[in-house]
């Protein structure tokens, strides 16, 4: 049993039941509901002719599982921040397997690629509207989605696409917003803003129930993946993607932000290492879902892990017959995928990258190889990511 703050008009006019977006709420027919702490305050300020009433309501078990909220009446907002070829699509699909979640795949793509310096304010505004289920108000967003269907942004939200396709409403703004409001976890995945810019949302949009997951991958693995066709075709146009100096410098800057957030907002920020998820899918996922408020891995997510971390999907086999590995599938033999660069890259190339990326490697707990034998072995030499970050932050 829980409580919500509602506002009852002193006048006799009734408020439409359609304005109440709380399933299972009782006796709310004549009430206007104020959802969210910021909205409560504004609602109270603007409705001097209203009186406040506390109403009991029942919460379904999925919502009750979600803890650590600053605003118990609103959905949880999860922002996954990373870079190209870090496993972010896989982690995004993992997150959308969680019950009662709505997933946005790369909502910032329509701004630019990557988001340029002058667009950070606009990017944060877009994310705010995405999280508040108001994408219909983002100028140019739906038009871009319809025009660029080949990017499959909406199609990557599997549950949404399955439902909207039956009603031919996938690009209808009102439909998207209404669908979004039915869910208690809104997830957005992006590789198009820096971590230092993403965390500003904590300050600029305090009304959100925001948790940020920073997904890191060994930069040697990311860089190796970016050299392969067809990724290399678009990656070469972006210095952050193709130039190790730019990329590893950005990772070093991210670590400064990681130190700040780990100290100031540990309940709202998590570093997730792709290698940990790949080598220990269930153990790492357990830690991830607990961060999001679940007591254990939900059955739907267990099914996802069983089908996406130990098999090669049919779509990948199709590409292999053409002599090309499919780079965008999230069906992986995860333990092989995470470490394949150790067999594919020359030791000379690895040594050069280790010099360029030493700060990032150390801060994230990735081992630097000094011999060909250790590089080619199947032994995991990496250290615990939390221990590595604590050691890095204490010395910087």
Residue ranges and their predicted role:
Residues 1-78, 84, 151-161, 227-230, ...:
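PAPS-dependent sulfotransferases, especially Golgi type II membrane carbohydrate sulfotransferases
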Residues 161, 166-167, 172-302, 309-329:
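PAPS-dependent sulfotransferase catalytic domain
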Residues 101, 113-116, 204-206, 265, ...:
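Cytochrome P450
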Residues 104-195, 233-236:
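PAPS-dependent sulfation machinery
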Residues 83-89:
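A short, glycine-centered helix-capping/turn motif at helix boundaries
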Residues 89-100:
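A conserved segment at the C-terminal end of the G1
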């Amino acid at each position: 049993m829980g409580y919500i703050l509602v506002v009852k008009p002193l006048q006799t006019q009734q408020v439409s039941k359609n304005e109440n977006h709380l399933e299972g709420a009782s006796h709310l027919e004549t009430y206007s509901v104020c959802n969210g702490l910021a909205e409560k305050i504004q609602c109270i300020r603007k409705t001097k002719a209203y009186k406040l009433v506390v109403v009991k309501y029942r919460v379904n078990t999925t919502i009750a599982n979600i803890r650590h909220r600053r605003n118990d009446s609103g959905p949880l907002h999860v922002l996954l921040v990373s870079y190209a070829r870090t496993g972010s699509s896989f982690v995004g699909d993992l997150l959308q397997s969680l019950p009662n979640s709505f997933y946005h795949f790369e909502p910032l793509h329509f701004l630019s690629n990557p988001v340029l310096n002058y667009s950070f304010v606009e990017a944060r505004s877009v994310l705010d509207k995405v999280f508040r289920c108001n994408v219909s108000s983002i100028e140019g967003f739906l038009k871009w989605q319809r025009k660029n269907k080949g990017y499959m942004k909406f199609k990557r939200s599997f549950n949404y696409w399955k439902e909207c396709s039956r009603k031919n409403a996938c690009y209808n703004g009102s439909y998207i917003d209404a669908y979004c409001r039915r869910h208690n976890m809104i997830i957005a995945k992006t590789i198009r803003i820096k971590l230092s810019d993403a965390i500003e949302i904590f300050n600029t949009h305090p009304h959100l129930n925001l948790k940020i997951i920073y997904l890191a991958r060994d930069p040697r693995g990311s860089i190796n993946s970016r050299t392969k066709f067809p990724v290399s075709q678009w990656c070469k146009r972006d210095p952050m993607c193709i130039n190790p100096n730019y990329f590893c410098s950005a990772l070093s800057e991210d670590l400064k932000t990681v130190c700040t957030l780990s100290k100031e907002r540990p309940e709202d920020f998590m570093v997730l290492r792709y290698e940990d998820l790949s080598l220990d899918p269930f153990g790492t996922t357990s830690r991830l879902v607990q961060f999001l408020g679940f007591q254990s891995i939900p059955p739907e997510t267990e099914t996802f892990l069983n089908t996406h971390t130990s098999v090669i999907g049919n779509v990948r086999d199709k590409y292999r017959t053409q002599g090309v590995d499919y780079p965008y599938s999230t069906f992986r033999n995860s333990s092989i995928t995470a470490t394949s660069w150790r067999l594919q890259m020359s030791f000379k190339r690895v040594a050069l990258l280790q010099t360029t990326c030493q700060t990032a490697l150390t801060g994230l707990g990735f081992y630097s190889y000094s011999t060909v034998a250790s590089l080619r072995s199947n032994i995991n030499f990496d250290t615990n990511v939390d221990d590595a970050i604590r050691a890095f932050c204490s010395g910087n």
